[in-house]
Amino acid sequence: FEYLSEDALLAGRVAAGITRGVQKHPGRGVTIKHFAFNNQETNRLNSCSHVSKRAARDLYLRSFEIVVREARPHAIMTSYNLLNGVHTSESAELLETVLRDEWGFEGLVMTDWVVAGMTRHDLKHPAATSAPTIKAGNELFMPGCETDRQGILSALRGRGEQVELSRSELEKQAARVVRMVWALAGS
């Protein structure tokens, strides 16, 4: 919904209203996207947004904060771009600290389609990969592939190229997926 309005308050309130309207129907959930700093479509796989903490909070994150706090969407989709040199899907500060700890988000965090394990090699910045994406707080890969699975298994075995994953970290993410399935099925 980053395209609803350039005004963060207006975008947040409109998105919150839409989210409440959809989610009032049993078994329906809304995914808010693209979290965050996705302000362009051209070259979006290759962009790195350099944003101060104040501008991030006052301008770019405010609309997301409003919809999370006011409407409790079932899911958030990360964006392709990097934020200050880190893929948004690999940013624990963004996904765990801000989204979950500060705003109280309890839903599912998912990647945009084919963010991890991308086969493109012509990008300025390396593609996001599965293990760091899980460690940062993503539960669902869209669509996920064999490269992702192998990266996760290597990280669990302590042989990950970038990070190591513990069984408890993976179980935490899996529990969030199960909670979402039950929430939507039980509605």
Question: How does the language model describe each region?
Answer:
Residues 1-187:
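Glycoside hydrolase catalytic-domain context in secreted enzymes
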